[in-house]
């Protein structure tokens, strides 16, 4: 049964209402499918390699094929969500993720598994930006901080639980079950979404889809991503890599020109008008490149060099899960009180410290409980503290700096940046650290490469903290009045209200004083899920603008 809610209800949902809780469950579970799959496969790599006879290059492509299609299409996915409906595209993404998951589970060869993973990336490109866009466009402004903080904590926990769940499934059954797990989760998400999530879209997007922009964006991201994968490892001839890079750069240049003149651009130029949006995405790229390297190598290192079982290797990161669950929402609240600059400086520096502590883990460390407590636990505790301090503030900063009506596109851009960063790390880090050939099966060689890799990732993470200190403003997440909201779908857009001086925050409690009380509703009674609006209408969020009438670049 589909929900009776329409776009008219969007933007008025109360977080603690039954509908608000169901919507959060749908977006968290949907996002968890993508986040879980991104981390659970790392634990399965040794088992996959043994079962299908894959070498190091093929195992890297098991990861990279997913990231390649995800990075290439995620911008288009965000644009489709804003244009055709966030609930519709989110649901389609869940379906397109489930079906290839079954193909992954039955893949008899590495080649088929790589293709199936690429198809999974297509589904993830549709559902990933849609989840945050649903939160930003359906909850009332005052409740978005609580919603985004809880979403960040629970999806972070899903990422951290991936290695544990994957390790248990591999030990108890087979690596193939890590993909079958997506089927029941997906069915639950589809049922909840159809019944409880209202539809919303950007009412200002009109006319046909910008097909030329879509093709250029996809070709550009795919070409550059392929070059980033194959360039460092030398898996393809130099001319092939150079051609892919050239085509990618040319396509993105053409995309930039096309979007300036398109009637309904996939990537509205105004999204990049905020310097804080650019800075937040730059910090995202640097920090997530470091995280991608650690998540890729740590569980493999623990299994190969220290003799951990898949379950034990996954459970080794359990403190990260607990810290994410306990501290992510508090990190968002801290960012609201003191500004995001402090947590985005301290968090990456703590991550770097945790990576340096991983240098103490060596082949002779042992795998007993006492050995874990002495060598592994201190590193993952500091690392987890840094992760919990960083994730919610950097996501909130990126989304709060972009216009509210472009929430799907802004989420797509930020997700694309983080995925390309992780992909770059997976491709380049083994080469830079001297890991190649059969080193993933040699305990001593892998340990040497792992230590070199941790030095590189620590330097990257520290650089991200310094970049945040230099470029992120403390008032980015400042509070704001409710943004002007466009009329619901199937109606003519209603006149917009006065542009608010600051965009509404995405995480945490507003720093600035609350706006003046709204005028009473001119008819109608607020329901349990939707408080009274300022004009008696139930409208989807419209543009918060890029600052006030004075043109200042406020968030």
Predicted regions and their residues:
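Intrinsic disorder in cytosolic terminal tails and internal cytosolic loops
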Residues: 1-19, 471-555
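Hydrophobic transmembrane-helix bundles of small-molecule transporters
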Residues: 171-284, 290, 308, 457-458, ...
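Glycine/proline-centered helix-kink
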Residues: 129, 150, 155-167, 221, ...
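12-transmembrane solute porter fold
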Residues: 21-43, 56, 237-244, 251, ...
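Transmembrane-helix bundle of Major Facilitator Superfamily
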Residues: 2-195, 344, 352, 356-359
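Interfacial helix-cap and linker-helix signal at transmembrane-aqueous boundaries
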Residues: 48-49, 80-81, 165-173, 228, ...
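Membrane-helix interface residues
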Residues: 84-85, 139-142, 172-173, 209, ...
